Amino acid sequence: MRRSYFLRCRVVAAGSITLNDIAGAFLLTFAGLFPIVNPIEAAPFFFGLTSGLSAAERNALARKVAINGFALLLGSMVLGPYLLEFFGIRLPVVRIAGGVVVTALGWKLLTQEDWSDHAGMPAGGRRKVGSFYPLTMPLTVGPGSMSVAITIGSRKTPGIPPLTEIAQKMTGALLGIIAIALTIYLAYRFASTMARVLGESGVEVLVRLSAFILMCIGIEIIWNGYSALIALPH
């Protein structure tokens, strides 16, 4: 009886650790990418670029952009760190540099009036609109978003972690990117009503709060990269 009770406690504890690791990786990925991707801010640009299309065509484009954005972010997160390492750049250095970039992006979002990955995109006008260019890149996923994804992908535990821990973090990161893709689709799908509901002040508040979280994540990534760098043999 007592043995079965302890076994149940161990199973519950293991399950909670698994959920905590997945939730932590999910929150890190989503909170790091959302302020830069910021589909709520990009939604009016999307609506302006697709204003000549029917509602059905606009919805189809929103779905394609979400899928393309998911593929770009996932590719940057998975392959980006190893491509840099292939060129002889150590991953801890990549983490430090990426952390500086993330912190700088967060600071710009927090202090400047008009700065984002969508800078320079026209709010209206007519141009040939494609699901990849310009709607996916650079309107939705630009260089800032991709650099954040690479930095998050390079954030690894020192040493050789167990396979279960790797699987949990990969699952959480994947869910985070899926959540970003869903926010892209929903923001673009309801772009015509979102700006009217939130208003300029609502979008401003959301961006500033997200920017502060992004700065904290950037500083934490810098510290992890520095800790890993000084631990390497010279």
Identify the function of each model-found stretch.
Residues R10-P35, Q112, A119-T136:
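Small-residue-enriched transmembrane helix starts and helix-helix packing motifs
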Residues A25-M77:
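Juxtamembrane transmembrane-helix termini in multi-pass membrane transport proteins
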Residues V100-P122, I217-A228:
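Transmembrane helix exit motif
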Residues S54-A55, G75-A97, T183-Y226:
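Transmembrane-helix boundary and interhelical-loop signature of multi-pass inner-membrane proteins
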Residues A55-P81, K156-A195:
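A small-residue-rich subset of transmembrane alpha-helices
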Residues N59-E113:
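Membrane helix-loop-helix hairpins that form the core translocation module of multi-pass transporters
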Residues A25-A42, L91-V101, G172-I184:
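Structural signature of hydrophobic alpha-helical transmembrane segments
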Residues R2-G24, P158, A228-H234:
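Short, strongly hydrophobic alpha-helical membrane anchors
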